[in-house]
Amino acid sequence: IKSSAASDVYKRQTPFSEQKGHQTAAVMQELVDDFFMKDGLSIEESPLYPEEPGFTKVGGQDIYNEWINREPRFYQSVFYQGKKWQVKNNVIEFYYGSKNGADKTSNFPATGYLLFKRTCRKLYNQGSSPKVQYRPSIIFRLADFYLLYAEVLTETDPANPKILEYIDKVRKRAGIPLLQDIRPEILGNQEALREAVRRERRVELCTEGQRFFDVRRWMVAEKDGYKQGGDFYGMNMFGPNGDRNAFYKKVLIENRIFEKKNYLYPIPLSQVQISNQMVQNPLW
């Protein structure tokens, strides 16, 4: 599957101030919060996660503390206010009244975050648009295989040391501490291992089309931490004009509906009508 810098995907990942990008490929706060800290622990467990809001100077810019000391995959996946765009090295801001604010264009990231993953870091200006750059689409990759293997072992043999070994193959490449070093006690604890595998899949495979199916095959789409329905949050794109600090207030973006029937797709009526032995999926 071919993708290029001039394609709709790249445009939706590009800020409006950078060659009038569409900047609509937004990332939810819930995904942002699921990335680990640089010590390999979740934000709920890590002492590095700030107890109070505030800012830290990074490259001369005030960066919100919640985005400091995160793992490398966070910085490669999420584009946030104050980060520099790789083409012209411009600082990008999204607050209301900024160059990329909701008052400047109807195309704005609803959550105040842009997807950065898969954005080509080597694009340069060519007239009014970036150069075309071939990027293959991700269908199946080695990290997915490693985590599926760890998942199978978790369900069949939770004391098998290969579980941590294969999760750690992914974590090592990601540049974060290994579970064998920081959480060896979870080996043999099936529930803890399930959570470890699932959290790793959430982060490593984010925006690759896996999460939708993962939470359904695990039958956890109504469980805290995995919910596909309910309230979803982001940064405040509609604060007072020019008020940069108002942007950092987390606000409700949308309420989604998930019902039990959504664990399975409905069988098309045309197929059900072919045979009276064909039974429609539950609740449809």
Question: At which residue positions do the language-model features occur?
Answer:
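Acidic/polar-rich alpha-helix caps and helix-coil junctions
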Residues: A5-Q23, D33-W284
